[in-house]
């Protein structure tokens, strides 16, 4: 395995670790509605950071975006909005299926859809079937799916042991939402694929290869922001017991604390895709769709490890922790299989 591929896998791991940790600051926010908290974090992660970093990277910000016609920008934006729909459904999936089953099904579906649909769309799925490296990377995808399933099972055992139940368990509704979430969340993978002309244009301007994907985030995350912020603002305006005015009528120190914590959560959310771009840049071009598989499987891996570090599994017993450990090992094996496949 080459150093470039190894570093690509490593940066995807760092990005996934940030994704697994980003909600921790949000949990410290007090006396705010979820909608206000999510909006403040989202404004930082989907608007302020992408625009600021792109302005720093590009020699002429407006000229860069002005060179693309609508046929290039619209698919990138719409795939970003597609991801935004999946993001909203993610929380609803947890409500009706519970954390472990919801995450397992949604992540499993988005891993498969986001990874395998891209080569199908590009018309090069035969690379996966008819080359040795392609078959090995395909094997890695399915091994990762097994690892996600094992970690999901560990979570179910933990929830059963600790008496944790879904907020409003509804199998039919939950499964439907999990499928919608899984499919629509893959929009981020499709957006990165559609944004290749933007990446190439950034490279032509002399932007470092590690950073060429970052300017496209202005458009991708703009689509996601439209859906997420629109959802939050509509709820804040329509739902009786929600009020942004009330949220900002708290004591000044608490408001400042909540803003800073929400902004930190937004920063950590953004960093997952900052390092995703670094990892993506190191993956061989013919296998660039494997970035999504690495990100999502490492997200599950890091989520389990973060849970152990934060002692969320302390009272779960030995068996759930053993099953979790097995799932994490399987995901690590899957990443190595994919890495070897890309190198062959």
Curated annotation (Swiss-Prot):
It is a multi-pass membrane protein. It holds the Pfam family RhaT. The chain crosses the membrane at residues 4-24, 38-58, 68-88, 101-121, 137-157, 175-195, 214-234, 259-279, 290-310, 321-341. GO terms for cellular component: plasma membrane. It is found in: Cell inner membrane. Its main location: membrane. Keywords: Cell inner membrane, Cell membrane, Membrane, Sugar transport, Symport, Transmembrane, Transmembrane helix, Transport. It comes from the Bacteria. GO terms for molecular function: rhamnose transmembrane transporter activity; symporter activity. Uptake of L-rhamnose across the cytoplasmic membrane with the concomitant transport of protons into the cell (symport system). Belongs to the L-rhamnose transporter (TC 2.A.7.6) family. This is L-rhamnose-proton symporter. It comes from Salmonella paratyphi A (strain AKU_12601).
């Amino acid at each position: 395995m080459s150093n470039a591929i190894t570093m690509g896998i490593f940066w995807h791991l760092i990005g996934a670790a940030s994704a697994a940790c980003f909600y921790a600051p949000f949990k410290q926010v007090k006396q705010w509605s979820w909608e206000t908290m999510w909006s403040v974090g989202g404004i930082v992660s989907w608007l302020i950071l992408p625009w600021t970093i792109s302005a720093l990277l590009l020699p002429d910000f407006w000229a860069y975006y002005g060179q693309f016609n609508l046929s290039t920008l619209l698919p990138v934006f719409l795939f970003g909005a597609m991801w935004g729909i999946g993001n909203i459904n993610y929380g609803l999936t947890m409500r009706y299926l519970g954390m472990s089953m919801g995450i397992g099904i949604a992540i499993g579906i988005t891993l498969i859809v986001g990874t395998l649909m891209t080569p199908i769309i590009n018309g090069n799925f035969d690379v996966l079937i008819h080359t040795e490296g392609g078959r090995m990377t395909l094997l890695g995808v399915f091994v990762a799916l097994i690892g996600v399933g094992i970690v999901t099972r560990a979570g179910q055992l933990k929830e059963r042991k600790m008496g944790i139940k879904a907020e409003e368990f509804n199998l039919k509704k939950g499964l439907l939402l999990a499928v919608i979430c899984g499919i629509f969340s893959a929009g981020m993978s499709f957006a990165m694929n559609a944004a290749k002309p933007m990446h190439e244009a950034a490279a032509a301007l002399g932007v470092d290869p590690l950073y060429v994907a970052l300017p496209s985030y202005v458009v991708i995350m703009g689509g996601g922001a439209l859906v997420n912020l629109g959802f939050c603002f509509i709820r804040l305006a329509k739902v009786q017991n929600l009020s942004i005015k009330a949220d900002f009528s708290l004591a000044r120190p608490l408001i400042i604390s909540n803003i800073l914590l929400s902004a930190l959560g937004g920063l950590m959310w953004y960093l997952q895709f900052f390092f995703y771009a670094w990892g993506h840049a190191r993956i061989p071009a013919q296998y660039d769709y494997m970035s999504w598989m690495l990100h999502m499987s490492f997200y599950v891996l890091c989520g389990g490890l973060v849970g152990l570090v934060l002692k969320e599994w302390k009272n779960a017993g030995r068996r759930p922790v053993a099953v979790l450990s097995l799932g994490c090992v399987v995901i690590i094996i899957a990443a190595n299989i994919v890495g070897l496949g890309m190198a062959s």
